Amino acid sequence: KELKPVLENEGAYEVSISPSESVIAYRYSTSNRPWELYVSKLKPGAEPFQITSSTTKEFDKHDWMKPEFIDFEADDGTTIYARVYEPKADRKNGAAVFFVHGAGYLQNAHHFWSGYFREYMFHHLLVEKGYTVLDLDYRASDGYGRDYRTAIYRHMGGRDLDDYIDAKKFMVENYDLDSNRIGIYGGSYGGFITLMALLTKPEEFACGAALRSVTDWSHYNHEYTSNILNY
């Protein structure tokens, strides 16, 4: 029997099937719309029924951007993935802001609603002001395999930061950016990378904002740190 897809829209689904296997309930989101709950008959072409509506009228007034999903080759040959938010040509100012997600091992270059929804809305504001925004899944981000995940073993602020330097070269060459007008920011591990960028690569970034950053790993969560630094 030929298998046919039931859910085909761009985005992400989390699905539960009824005991009778005739109905599904699922959670669905896209890169610019948050998660909502739906039910549908389990057959191709079935019309879903939306159960929840979690956005406000104020939220729905905005034409929230869908990011461009890109990839490029780092200097060691590894493919790196990212989201790019680009302003319209008449607003573009040639400057850029690079965002560093937290935890090290998270993933943000995906097609569904990000846990970084506050930053997403901030990036939307930056784009309206003319800035290009890069949201990078740097080395050690989740979902790209063992070698990717362990690339920062015993050297946090090494290969992961290098990916931002390589990203800068790519963005300047392909998005008409001024290499002297690129800033970087992030929180937690993203704050740590921001500090490493400003302190060890000051010639690369015009400015940075390190939010709630880790500054001394010896006083951070031992279970997290020991797995990476192996002490």
Protein language model regions, located:
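Blade-edge beta-strand/turn elements of extracellular beta-propeller
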Residues: 2-8
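Serine-hydrolase catalytic core recognition
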Residues: 7, 14-231
